[in-house]
C-alpha cells in the first residue's frame, strides 16, 4: 500500500504538533489582539532607552525592567535579571541576562536561547560562547538572554502555558515583536523583552533553537541569504545545511530583521538533550561571527568553506496518513532521490499500512523521533532548492 502525502512547505514549519488545535488558538489570539492594535503602536514605536532597575535583588542579582548596555561598566561581565510579564499570582517572570562589556567600543550582539522551553542545546551553546569571552580583550558588547520563555522551560515543554482561557499553550516564537498591551501573557512578555531589552542593545542578533520534542532536526541555519550582512555571518558556520528562507512573521529573528537588525536562527539538533558535538560547531561559528565583526581578535576557525554545505530554499513535509509505528529508511542529512522510499508505517498487528516516498531530490533535514504517529504528523522534511520560491505563505504550528 503506497501513500505519498506530500505538501510543499516554504516556511519554517518543522515543529507541527497539532495543526488544528494550534491554528484555532492562533486565530483566537489574532482576533483578540486586533483590539489592542492602537495601543501596540504606541508601546512599540520606539525602543526604550536607558537602564531602569526595579530595586529588587533576586539570588544576589539586580533586576532591571529596561537595559541599555552602554550604561554598564566596560571590561567586566555583568549578570542580572530582566523583569518580564506578571504571572497570575502577580509575581513576575524573570529572564537571565549576561553581558560581556568590552574595554573598547564596538558592535553590540545579542545571543538568544530558550524561546522554546524544550531546546536545551540552544541554551548550552550560548552559555559556552559567553564562558569563552574575556571582556578585557573585547571591543564591543555581547549580551546573552538564555531563558526567554521561563514558564515553558520550567516544564521543559515547547510552548508557553497560558491560563487566560483555561488550558492553552502558546508558541511565543509566533508572537514577536510582541505587544506590551497584548491579549496574552506571552505576547506581552515578548513585547517587554523586544522593546526594552533585545532591540535597544543589538546591532545584530542570533536566535538559537533546536528541533522539538518528538521531532529531530539536523544542524542547519535558517536565514535570509539574500541579505548580504546575514549571508556573511551564516557562511562562517561549519555546519552542513542552510535553509535559505525568509520564514514568516512572528519569529524572533524576523522581528529583528524588520527593524533593520541583521539576524538569523541556528538549529542545533534534537530537543531535550545536549548534543555536545553539534554544539561545538555552533560555538565555533559564533566565535567566527564575533571575530568577523571585530568584537574579538584572532584568526577564524572552520567555516562553511571547510564542510560540504547543502543549501535549500524550501522544505517538503512528508505527513503521516495512518496511525501506527514509524520506521525510517533514511537518516538526517541523507541525500534522497525523487521516488525514494523514506519511511514505512505498521499497525498494531505489524502489518505495513503505509509507505512514504519523496517526490523530489534533496537532503533530509528533519525526522519524527517519536516511534508512533497519528495521521497528519510530519514524518520527515526534505530540504531542496526550488527555482522559483513561493512567497507570503504562513503555516499554523
Describe each PLM feature range.
Residues 3, 7-22, 38-397:
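Structured catalytic-domain cores with a bias toward divalent-metal coordination
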Amino acid at each position: 500500500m503506497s501513500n505519498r502525502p506530500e505538501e510543499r512547505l516554504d516556511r519554517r514549519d518543522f515543529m507541527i504538533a497539532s495543526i488544528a488545535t494550534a491554528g484555532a488558538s492562533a486565530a483566537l489570539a489574532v482576533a483578540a489582539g486586533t483590539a489592542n492594535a492602537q495601543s501596540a503602536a504606541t508601546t512599540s514605536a520606539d525602543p526604550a532607552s536607558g537602564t531602569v532597575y526595579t530595586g529588587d535583588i533576586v539570588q544576589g542579582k539586580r533586576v532591571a525592567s529596561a537595559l541599555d548596555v552602554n550604561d554598564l561598566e566596560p571590561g567586566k561581565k555583568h549578570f542580572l535579571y530582566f523583569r518580564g510579564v506578571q504571572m497570575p499570582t502577580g509575581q513576575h517572570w524573570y529572564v537571565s541576562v549576561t553581558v560581556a562589556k568590552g574595554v573598547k567600543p564596538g558592535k553590540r550582539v545579542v545571543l538568544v536561547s530558550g524561546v522554546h522551553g524544550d531546546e536545551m542545546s540552544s541554551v548550552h551553546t550560548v552559555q559556552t560562547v559567553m564562558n569563552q569571552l574575556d571582556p578585557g580583550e573585547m571591543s564591543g558588547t555581547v549580551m546573552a538572554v538564555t531563558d526567554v520563555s521561563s514558564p515553558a522551560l520550567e516544564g521543559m515543554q515547547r510552548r508557553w502555558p497560558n491560563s487566560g482561557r483555561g488550558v492553552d499553550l502558546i508558541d511565543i516564537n509566533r508572537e514577536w515583536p510582541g505587544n506590551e498591551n497584548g491579549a496574552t501573557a506571552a505576547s506581552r512578555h515578548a513585547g517587554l523583552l523586544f522593546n526594552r531589552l533585545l532591540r535597544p542593545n543589538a546591532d545584530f542578533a542570533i536566535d538559537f533553537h533546536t528541533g522539538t520534542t518528538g521531532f529531530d532536526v539536523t544542524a542547519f541555519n535558517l536565514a535570509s541569504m539574500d541579505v548580504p550582512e546575514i549571508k556573511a555571518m551564516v557562511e562562517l558556520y561549519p555546519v552542513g545545511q542552510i535553509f535559505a528562507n525568509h520564514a514568516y512573521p512572528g519569529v524572533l529573528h524576523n522581528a529583528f530583521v524588520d527593524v533593520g537588525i541583521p539576524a538569523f536562527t541556528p538549529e542545533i539538533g534534537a530537543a531535550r538533550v545536549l548534543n555536545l558535538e553539534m554544539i561545538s560547531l555552533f560555538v565555533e561559528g559564533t566565535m567566527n561571527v564575533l571575530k568577523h565583526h571585530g568584537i574579538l581578535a584572532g584568526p577564524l576557525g572552520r567555516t562553511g568553506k571547510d564542510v560540504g554545505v547543502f543549501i535549500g530554499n524550501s522544505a517538503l513535509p512528508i505527513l503521516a496518513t495512518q496511525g501506527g509505528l514509524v520506521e525510517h529508511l533514511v537518516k538526517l542529512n541523507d541525500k534522497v532521490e525523487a521516488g525514494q522510499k523514506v519511511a514505512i508505517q505498521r499497525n498494531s498487528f505489524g502489518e505495513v499500512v503505509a509507505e512514504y516516498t519523496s517526490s523530489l531530490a534533496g537532503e533530509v533535514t528533519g525526522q519524527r523521533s517519536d516511534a508512533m504517529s497519528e495521521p497528519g504528523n510530519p514524518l520527515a522534511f526534505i530540504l531542496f532548492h526550488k527555482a522559483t520560491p513561493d512567497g507570503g505563505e504562513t503555516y499554523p504550528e
